[in-house]
């Protein structure tokens, strides 16, 4: 193992742990009286602010902002606005679904992406997408089958978590298409437009700003404007944890790790996120999964690995990862 790989792998693990922290912190935040809309409003507002500070303190990133093509800017704004559906459904689901179970179910998204790619994007060869889908469905069935009926979360919450996975999968397909990937380019060199545009930190800051703006408008529309006075004092440290650890730290460590080991390997290593959520949920929230649910989680992870390790045709993009979005 070379030095870059040795440094990159721990960074991706730290990133996965950071993202997992956001799921686990949601429950104690909700316990203070803060609901999902308020949580995501502040998460993306403060996250976008930190993102712009990170851009502006670096002359290289400032230069990338100035050079950012207009099309890339519009794409980032559009994707940021669309991302509200994924984040909103997931955190709304976490109001009633335990973080451990939600973390397992939502991680079916790489498999959904692989299947959707058969029709809407650069398809993966062979039967792997269908094998992965079968494993993911079986894993989800086991995860749900092990739920204690006496303490089962409402079906609405489970549907919200699944909706989050589906919306994020569609979002990834759209992001690839808007960035220039063409389904009819299969087997040929990737078009120039599909290459990374601008600095990743700049793109993320723009996207998070768009997401924050949509949530701010949504809050005004339902009579819930951003008002710090409405946040209980005990919720602020937890909100800070979501912003600093689950957003800023997770994003930056993923970028740093992916630059060292590549997005494909980073995507594979990121599959440690659901197990981390399960462990953190047990340690800090006392949440546990039944043995049959753990078996289901294992099947889902195997499905993700099958989808992520499928050989890609020449010119096909690397597997979708959190590099393309703030999650």
Please identify what each model-predicted range represents.
Residues 16, 42, 102-108, 174-212, ...:
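Helix-helix packing/entry segments at the starts of transmembrane helices
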Residues 18-23, 56-101, 105-106, 142, ...:
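Specific transmembrane alpha-helical segments of multi-pass solute transporters/efflux pumps
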Residues 29, 39, 43, 93, ...:
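Hydrophobic/aromatic residues within transmembrane alpha-helices
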Residues 1-42, 81, 85, 89, ...:
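Glycine-/small-residue-enriched transmembrane alpha-helix faces in small-molecule transporters
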Residues 7-15, 62-89, 133, 156-164, ...:
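Loop-to-transmembrane-helix transition segments
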Residues 26, 31-85, 110-116, 166-174, ...:
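Transmembrane alpha-helices of multi-pass small-molecule transport proteins
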Residues 51, 125-147, 164, 280, ...:
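Hydrophobic transmembrane alpha-helices of multi-pass small-molecule transport proteins
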Residues 50-55, 109-134, 275-295:
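C-terminal transmembrane-helix exit sites in multi-pass transporters
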């Amino acid at each position: 193992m070379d030095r870059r790989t040795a440094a990159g792998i721990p960074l991706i693990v730290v990133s996965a742990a950071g993202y997992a922290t956001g799921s686990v912190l949601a429950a104690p935040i909700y316990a203070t009286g803060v609901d999902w809309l308020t949580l995501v409003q502040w998460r993306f507002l403060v996250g976008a602010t930190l993102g712009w500070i990170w851009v502006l303190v670096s002359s290289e990133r400032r230069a990338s902002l100035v050079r950012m093509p207009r099309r890339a800017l519009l794409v980032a704004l559009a994707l940021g606005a669309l991302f509200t559906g994924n984040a909103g459904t997931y955190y709304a689901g976490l109001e009633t679904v335990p973080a451990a179970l939600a973390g397992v179910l939502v991680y079916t998204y790489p498999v959904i992406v692989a299947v959707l790619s058969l029709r809407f994007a650069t398809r993966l060869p062979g039967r792997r997408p269908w094998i992965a889908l079968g494993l993911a469905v079986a894993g989800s069935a086991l995860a749900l089958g092990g739920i204690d009926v006496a303490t089962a979360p409402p079906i609405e919450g489970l549907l919200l978590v699944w909706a989050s996975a589906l919306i994020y999968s569609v979002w990834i397909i759209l992001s690839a298409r808007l960035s220039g990937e063409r389904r009819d380019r299969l087997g040929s060199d990737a078009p120039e437009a599909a290459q990374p545009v601008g600095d990743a930190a700049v793109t993320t800051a723009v996207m998070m700003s768009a997401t924050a703006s949509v949530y701010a408008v949504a809050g005004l529309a339902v009579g819930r404007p951003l008002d710090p006075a409405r946040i209980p004092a005990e919720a602020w440290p937890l909100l800070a944890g979501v912003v600093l650890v689950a957003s800023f730290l997770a994003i930056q460590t993923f970028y740093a790790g992916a630059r060292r080991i590549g997005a494909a390997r980073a995507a594979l290593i990121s599959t440690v996120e659901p197990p981390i959520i399960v462990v953190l949920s047990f340690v800090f929230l006392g949440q546990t999964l039944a043995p049959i649910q753990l078996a289901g989680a294992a099947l889902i992870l195997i499905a993700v690995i099958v989808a992520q390790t499928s050989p890609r045709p020449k010119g096909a993009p690397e597997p979708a990862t959190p590099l393309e979005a703030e999650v």
